[in-house]
Swiss-Prot record:
Gene of this entry: hoxb3
Stated name of the protein: Homeobox protein Hox-B3
One protein family per Pfam: Homeodomain
SUPFAM superfamilies per the UniProt record, alphabetical: Homeodomain-like (SSF46689)
Matching CDD domains: homeodomain (cd00086)
GO CC field: nucleus
GO BP terms in the entry: anterior/posterior pattern specification; embryonic skeletal system morphogenesis
Subcellular location: Nucleus
């Protein structure tokens, strides 16, 4: 019943990291836009940003 782990392509990661560098928090319209752009669900984007913020915080 558990969903498979998403494997992000290097192109997707470049875009996600670029966006994160610019802004650590994403508003919904931007999230919708990124989801469409990267062929990912809004949920995947949201969770990637959550995880990335935790990594950022840990590395501070």
């Amino acid at each position: 019943s558990k969903r498979a782990r998403t494997a992000y392509t290097s192109a997707q990661l470049v875009e996600l990291e670029k966006e994160f560098h610019f802004n650590r928090y994403l508003c919904r319209p931007r999230r919708v836009e990124m989801a469409n752009l990267l062929n990912l669900s809004e949920r995947q984007i949201k969770i990637w940003f959550q995880n990335r913020r935790m990594k950022y915080k840990k590395d501070q």
